[in-house]
UniProtKB/Swiss-Prot annotation:
Short name of one Pfam family: IL6
Family that this chain belongs to: Belongs to the IL-6 superfamily.
Entry's Gene Ontology molecular function annotations: cytokine activity; growth factor activity; interleukin-6 receptor binding
This protein's name: Interleukin-6
Position of the signal peptide: 1-29
Sites carrying sugar chains: N38
Phosphoserine, modified sites: S81
């Protein structure tokens, strides 16, 4: 009798076991909780809202501030006016009136396109930052990862209206310098310009 009972129900037991395994592997999506709103890790922000995108930008700005602070703690002339000497050699993406990101003449679509294109152009400068920064590399890598995530989010918003710019590896060579002060000045300028660039983009990000 026991043998018959086992024979009859073993297929059902196997099926239930498989169902439990599949349920564990692929959990049913639930509503997003409050913890998600404060989670600025790139993998979570791909499913995003304007609020979460804004949180990601603020997360990036915090990382920029942390790197600048670390550099300034080691360099007494960290952010003085002499930086303009190094700035003349850098062609950093900047917001202009025609880009639609300023309060006057604001245009969300144009601003989003400019923001995405500009962040793509910043990639080569971030590579320079990673090569030259002698501090916490983990912070720099997290900054780059967060910016790549932001680019992906923005690309979805503008539906492929821009193409990835060509990589100019020779630019990295031109930015190199044996002078420690010039090197640090360039890093600071890149970080400060990137922060300003992101701040101007927030108006377009906040709109539904």
């Amino acid at each position: 009798m026991n043998s018959l009972f086992t024979s009859a129900f073993s297929p059902l037991a196997v099926s239930l076991g498989l169902l439990l395994v599949m349920t564990s592997a692929f959990p049913t999506p639930g509503p997003l909780g409050e913890d998600f709103k404060n989670d600025t890790t790139p993998s979570r922000l791909l499913l995003t809202t304007p609020e979460k995108t804004e949180a990601l930008i603020k997360h990036i700005v915090d990382k920029i501030s942390a790197i600048r602070k670390e550099i300034c703690e080691k360099n007494d002339e960290c952010e003085n006016s002499k930086e303009t000497l190094a700035e003349n050699k850098l062609k950093l993406p900047k917001m202009e009136e025609k880009d639609g990101c300023f309060q006057s003449g604001f245009n969300q679509a144009i601003c989003l396109i400019k923001t995405t294109a500009g962040l793509l152009e910043y990639q080569i400068y971030l590579d320079f930052l990673q090569n030259e920064f002698e501090g916490n590399q983990e912070t720099v890598m997290e900054l780059q990862s967060s910016i790549r995530t932001l680019i992906q989010i923005l690309k979805e918003k503008i539906a492929g209206l821009i193409t990835t710019p060509a990589t100019h590896t020779d630019m990295l060579e031109k930015m190199q310098s044996s002078n420690e002060w010039v090197k640090n000045a360039k890093v600071i300028i890149i970080l400060r310009s990137l922060e300003n660039f992101l701040q101007f983009s927030l108006r377009a990000i906040r709109m539904k």
